[in-house]
Amino acid sequence: MAASLVGKKIVFVTGNAKKLEEVIQILGDNFPCTLEAQKIDLPEYQGEPDEISIQKCREAARQVQGPVLVEDTCLCFNALGGLPGPYIKWFLQKLKPEGLHQLLAGFEDKSAYALCTFALSTGDPSQPVLLFRGQTSGQIVMPRGSRDFGWDPCFQPDGYEQTYAEMPKSEKNTISHRFRALHKLQEYFSVAAGAGDH
């Protein structure tokens, strides 16, 4: 499947220019495809993260009629059994980073994990959607740092004194959940290229 995509344009489904910028930065110059951002209105699916990613990717591929890459991000609070999870976008819109921090006010456990799933489709509905997952563990803290990237101000990765928002982009992009997922996507393409996609 990867070999059939090499050299082709893949539509990365996002309306967020910052996200495209970060993805291109992480993938670097050696990624064998061209990513082009396109905002597509997809239904808000419910369910487990993998199910949501597959449904979104299939629908995006149907609309684009070609190869697509869809990203889904979850922020999961362990004290809340994994919530907000895939619904983080809506929680963030209503509560802002301060409100996310407040959600855990009554809990000792402030641990959380950020999960990023990239779903890739060739655009052919008979081919399976491939999933590439990355996860980073951390703590939910009082928001600190720049406010230009979602919930970054209240997520402090384990082993670091800074929140995602306080870190230089170059550092964040070597440890983030998005980096880990994209690293798996890169590996998939390089293994497929090396093996002639057999």
UniProtKB/Swiss-Prot annotation:
It catalyses: ITP + H2O = IMP + diphosphate + H(+); dITP + H2O = dIMP + diphosphate + H(+); XTP + H2O = XMP + diphosphate + H(+); N(6)-hydroxy-dATP + H2O = N(6)-hydroxy-dAMP + diphosphate + H(+). Mg(2+) binds at residue 44. The modification Phosphoserine is found at residue 146. One of its GO terms (cellular component) is cytosol. Disruption phenotype: Pups die about 2 weeks after birth with growth retardation and heart failure. Accumulates ITP in erythrocytes. Accumulates inosine in RNA and deoxyinosine in DNA. ITP binds at residues 14-19, 56, 72-73, 89, 149-152, 172, 177-178. GO terms for biological process: chromosome organization; deoxyribonucleoside triphosphate catabolic process; ITP catabolic process. Its EC number is 3.6.1.66. It comes from the Eukaryota. One of its GO terms (molecular function) is nucleoside triphosphate diphosphatase activity. The keyword Manganese applies. The modification N-acetylalanine is found at residue 2. Binds 1 divalent metal cation per subunit; can use either Mg(2+) or Mn(2+). Coiled coil: none annotated. Homodimer. Belongs to the HAM1 NTPase family. This is Inosine triphosphate pyrophosphatase. The gene is Itpa.
